[in-house]
């Protein structure tokens, strides 16, 4: 699943490609993608709207319209591809947006798990899904003290599963939680409440650093992720533990191990991240 760095990269590529363009028509080839409205009504609301910006909130892509927002979540395999001219949809193309200049935006999704829905300016941040999200790691309101207070209430919850909770800390998925905890020197099974203030500060600091580095490198392509230009990310070349099971730790030489935690594959170095 694309995580925050990948979604941020997608937004940065889409912004210059679609901003300022007016929607002439929309073809919904698979109605399963559309949420909240009948597909015909959904299309009716979009025609004539101009995309004024492309924003991101957590892992959601927000197409800012003249009136409201088109909210998209890529889930496992969703991808957007802009084309300068009309282009035939391929097997896994599920939505085609045609603009008045005859350029198009295709949404492709092999797994069909992605979603699109409309929100008004008034409801975009006050109704699910965005209303359920916490602050992002970059937000100045995410202080060490505030995060420490939240984690102190989690007496039995592992720090790994706590950081994956988007109502606690938005934008960290499996890859970047594993990398954050490695860099912070915190074992993933530690109870969240057991972390000292200093450890929480390291986790917060490293989370921001990991995400910024991943964004700079276009995200991580582990399986099939590609941005709207078709380019793959390169941060996977910098991963210390994720996907490195059985390899020597680049810091200490100990073998990287993998376990299941909360149903998620979890990678760590037992020497650098002691319990």
Curated annotation (Swiss-Prot):
Instruction: List positions binding DNA.
Output: 92, 111, 155
Q: Which residues form the active site?
A: 2-3, 59, 264
Q: Name one GO molecular function term.
A: 8-oxo-7,8-dihydroguanine DNA N-glycosylase activity
Start and end residues, zinc fingers (FPG-type): 240-274
From the UniProt record, give one GO term of the biological process aspect.
base-excision repair
Instruction: Identify the cofactor(s).
Output: Zn(2+)
The protein's annotated catalytic reaction(s) are: Hydrolysis of DNA containing ring-opened 7-methylguanine residues, releasing 2,6-diamino-4-hydroxy-5-(N-methyl)formamidopyrimidine; 2'-deoxyribonucleotide-(2'-deoxyribose 5'-phosphate)-2'-deoxyribonucleotide-DNA = a 3'-end 2'-deoxyribonucleotide-(2,3-dehydro-2,3-deoxyribose 5'-phosphate)-DNA + a 5'-end 5'-phospho-2'-deoxyribonucleoside-DNA + H(+)
Bound how, and how many: what does the cofactor note say? Binds 1 zinc ion per subunit.
Q: Which SMART domains match?
A: Fapy_DNA_glyco, H2TH
* SUPFAM superfamilies linked: Glucocorticoid receptor-like (DNA-binding domain), N-terminal domain of MutM-like DNA repair proteins, S13-like H2TH domain
Q: Which Pfam families match?
A: Fapy_DNA_glyco, H2TH, zf-FPG_IleRS
Protein family per UniProt: Belongs to the FPG family.
State what this protein does.
Answer: Involved in base excision repair of DNA damaged by oxidation or by mutagenic agents. Acts as a DNA glycosylase that recognizes and removes damaged bases. Has a preference for oxidized purines, such as 7,8-dihydro-8-oxoguanine (8-oxoG). Has AP (apurinic/apyrimidinic) lyase activity and introduces nicks in the DNA strand. Cleaves the DNA backbone by beta-delta elimination to generate a single-strand break at the site of the removed base with both 3'- and 5'-phosphates.
Show the HAMAP family listed in the entry.
Answer: Fapy_DNA_glycosyl
| Quaternary assembly | Monomer.
Q: What is this protein called?
A: Formamidopyrimidine-DNA glycosylase
User: What is the scientific name of the source organism?
Assistant: Exiguobacterium sp. (strain ATCC BAA-1283 / AT1b)
């Amino acid at each position: 699943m694309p995580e925050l760095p990948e979604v941020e990269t997608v937004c940065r590529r889409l912004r210059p490609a679609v901003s300022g363009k007016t929607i002439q028509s929309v073809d919904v080839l698979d109605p399963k993608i559309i949420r909240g409205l009948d597909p015909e009504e959904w299309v009716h609301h979009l025609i004539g709207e101009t995309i004024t910006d492309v924003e991101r909130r957590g892992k959601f892509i927000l197409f800012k319209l003249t009136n409201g927002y088109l909210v998209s979540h890529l889930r496992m395999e969703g991808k957007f591809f802009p084309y300068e001219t009309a282009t035939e949809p391929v097997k896994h193309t599920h939505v085609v947006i045609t603009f008045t200049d005859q350029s198009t935006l295709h949404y492709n999704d092999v797994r069909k798990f992605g979603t699109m829905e409309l929100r008004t300016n008034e409801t975009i941040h006050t109704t699910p899904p965005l209303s359920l999200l916490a602050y992002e790691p970059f937000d100045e309101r995410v202080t060490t003290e505030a995060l420490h207070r939240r984690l102190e209430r989690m007496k039995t919850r592992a720090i790994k599963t706590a950081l994956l909770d988007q109502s606690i800390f938005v934008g960290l998925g499996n890859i970047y939680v594993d990398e954050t905890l490695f860099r912070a020197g915190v074992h993933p099974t530690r109870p969240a409440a057991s972390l000292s203030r200093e450890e929480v500060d390291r986790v917060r600091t490293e989370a921001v650093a990991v995400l910024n580095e991943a964004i700079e490198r276009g995200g991580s392509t582990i399986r099939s992720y590609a941005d709207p230009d078709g380019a793959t990310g390169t941060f996977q070349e910098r991963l210390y533990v994720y996907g490195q099971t059985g390899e020597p730790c680049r810091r200490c030489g100990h073998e990287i191990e993998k376990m299941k935690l909360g149903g998620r594959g979890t990678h760590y170095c037992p020497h650098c991240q002691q319990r």
